[in-house]
């Protein structure tokens, strides 16, 4: 009986657990470690903030999903990983051993700017963000898809929003549509302006300008979780786990890495993580059975649906872009279908 340890309840592991709830993984003892028994689905976070969804519509029960997949749920954070001895240490001091380790623990916003960690509110974890989000004048550092969607969701809620973007997050027609959407909603968009520091207040320092806000949200690009660097698992220059074509660690084949914490060559997106989770569901069965694993087919032209506060969205794939209310309803259908899958009761039982 192989001990399979799942760290994190991101998109990939959610898909994996939903699959195992329908068809159990025989020959394995599963354990899931994640800090939150209930988790907000990231794609529905802007809609939750904008008021289009209730909290219960935008979150799923991690503990219940694990139970349906016959996995033991451990509500805890990871302190360290020692790949040499195949052990994970939790923040409360407990130690867990594994035969197979699957990492889908996400990332953290880059917070190397002075004062960002102390005086700004990181976008992740979403649960803490939603519980701590208040104020009428909010600054957001980072104008990627997450930052832009948050800015427009908060503006829809009536907040004054200033959005700082050091570098263009989108190119071409998509970039023009996003910037136009921000301007139309009277968001104070400041492209090419880096946040140099955050001081108590909170006060944002950008160049020679100093401005006080009720809240500063930190939505910059993803940074690797610190404990990966000391794990012994091979990582890339940014600290993300290097994986082969089957999403296994190049240094430790008993370790899988998926989603934000993996270095796959793709953009760090939930769309890709979902596909990785579907592959993992099949490859864990193959690993237990001792048969060759399937390779992951990377996707260069994933669909992007970016919400704009109201029930309106921008759609893009490759060089094609469009926008309208229809795009929001399309995204709403996709997201609700996803949540329904995570809540679906199992159709099979262990005999």
Question: What is each of the regions a protein language model found here?
Answer:
Residues 310-351:
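C-terminal auxiliary extensions adjacent to catalytic cores
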Residues 116-136, 202, 210-275, 282:
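FAD-site-proximal beta/loop scaffold in flavoenzymes
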Residues 261-309:
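A conserved FAD-binding loop/helix module that cradles the flavin
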Residues 3-4, 68-137, 217:
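FAD-binding core/adjacent interface of flavoenzyme oxidoreductases
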Residues 73-81, 88, 96, 158-245:
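A Rossmann-like FAD-binding core segment of flavoenzymes
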Residues 1-71, 149-173:
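Beta1-alpha1 glycine-rich phosphate/pyrophosphate-binding loop at the start
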Residues 128-164:
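Rossmann-like NAD(P)H-binding beta-loop-alpha module
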Residues 7-9, 103, 141-142:
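Conserved N-terminal Rossmann-fold NAD(P)-binding element of oxidoreductases
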């Amino acid at each position: 009986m192989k001990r399979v340890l799942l760290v994190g309840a991101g998109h990939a592991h959610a898909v994996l657990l939903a699959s195992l709830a329908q068809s159990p993984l025989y020959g394995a003892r599963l354990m899931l470690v994640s800090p939150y028994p209930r988790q907000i689905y990231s794609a529905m976070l802007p809609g939750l903030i904008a008021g289009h969804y209730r909290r219960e519509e935008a979150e799923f029960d991690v503990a219940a999903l694990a139970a349906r997949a016959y996995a033991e749920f451990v509500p805890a954070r990871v302190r360290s990983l020692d790949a040499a001895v195949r052990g994970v240490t939790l923040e409360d001091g407990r130690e867990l051993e594994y035969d197979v380790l699957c990492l889908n623990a996400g990332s953290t916003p880059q917070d190397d700017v002075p004062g960002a960690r102390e005086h700004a509110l990181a976008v992740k974890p979403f649960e803490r963000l939603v519980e701590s989000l208040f104020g009428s004048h909010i600054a957001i550092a980072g104008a990627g898809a997450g930052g832009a969607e948050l800015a427009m969701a908060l503006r829809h809620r009536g907040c004054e929003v200033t959005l700082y973007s050091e570098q263009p997050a989108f190119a071409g027609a998509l970039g023009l549509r996003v910037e136009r959407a921000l301007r139309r909603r009277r968001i104070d968009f400041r492209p090419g302006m880096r946040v140099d520091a955050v001081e108590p207040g909170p006060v944002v320092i950008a160049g020679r300008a100093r401005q006080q806000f009720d809240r500063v949200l930190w939505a910059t690009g993803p940074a690797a979780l610190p404990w990966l660097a000391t794990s012994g698992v091979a990582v890339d220059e940014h600290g993300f786990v290097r994986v082969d074509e089957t999403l296994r660690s190049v240094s430790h084949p008993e370790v899988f890495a998926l989603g934000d914490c993996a270095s796959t060559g793709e953009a760090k997106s939930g769309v890709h993580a979902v596909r990785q989770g579907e592959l993992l569901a099949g490859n864990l069965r193959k690993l237990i059975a001792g048969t060759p694993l399937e390779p992951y087919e990377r996707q260069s032209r994933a669909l992007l649906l970016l919400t704009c506060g109201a029930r309106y969205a921008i759609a893009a794939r490759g060089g094609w872009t469009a926008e309208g209310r229809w795009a929001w309803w399309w995204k709403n259908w996709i997201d609700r279908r996803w949540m329904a899958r995570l809540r679906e009761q199992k159709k099979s039982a262990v005999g």
